[in-house]
Amino acid sequence: MVSKRLQAQNFGDSMSATEPAGGQQERSLGDEIVGRIDELAAVSEAPQHLTRMFLTKQHRAAADLILGWMRSAGMRAHLDAIGNVCGRYEGEAAGSPCLMLGSHYDTVRDAGKWDGPLGLITAISCVAELQKKGRRLPFAVEVIGFADEEGVRFASTLLGSRAVAGTFDERLLGAKDSAGISMRDALSQFGLDPNHIGAAARARGELLGYIELHIEQGPVLEAQGLPVGVVTAIAG
C-alpha cells in the first residue's frame, strides 16, 4: 500500500534513473509508470474527469492499451471471457505455477488515476525489467488487470476476480445497466463470449500467491510519515 504523500511526490523520484555510457539519462522506471498511468487516465468517458466503466468503448480501449504494454514486456497476453487482461511471463520451466500480480482497470465515476492502475502498471514494468535482463524465475509471473472491481455499471462488484476465483454467479449475466443493456449483451458487444466465463477460473495449484500494490485510501500511513505499508487483513 502506497501512501498519499508518495503519490503526491513525483513517483519517478523514488526509483533511480540509470546513466548509460553515452551520458544520456534513461527514463527511470518510476517515470515510465507515471507516464503510463497518465496515458491510461486519458481514456475516459468524460473529458473533465476520469470515468471508465465496465464494458464501455473506453474500457475496451484501455484493455487494448494494457495488452500492448504486456506484450512489449515479453508476456503472452489475452482477454478472458469476463474482460480481464491477462499476461504471462514464463518461468525457467514452461507451465510452472505462477505468482500473480495486478489490480483493476475499471473506475468509479470521477475517479482518481492511481486507484487500480498503480498496481497493474507497476507489475507490467517489473516484468519488463526481467525481460530486459534476460531473467527467468523458478516460477511464472502473471499480471492481471481485473475488468470490474467497482461494480458501477451493473451494481455488482468484483466481477473480474470472482471469475478467476471460480465464484462468478451466471445469474448476474441478466443484470441490466441504466440504459437497459444486459451484462450478457454488453459482453458480446465487447467481443467476448459470456458462455466461457467459467474457463477464467484458476485452480489453487496454479497460483503461488497474489500481490497487489495499491494506493492508501485512508490517513494512517500519511499520518505516520510512512511511504508504504503491508496489508495483513482485509474486510469483504
Regions found by a protein language model. Name each.
Residues 17-56:
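N-terminal capping segment at the start of a domain
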Residues 101, 111-149:
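Alpha-helical metal-binding/catalytic segments enriched in His/Glu/Asp
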Residues 7-10:
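Charged/polar low-complexity intrinsically disordered segments
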Residues 148-149, 153-236:
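Midchain, well-structured core segments that form catalytic/ion-binding scaffolds
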Residues 42-90:
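A non-catalytic alpha/beta surface segment that caps or lines the substrate-entry region
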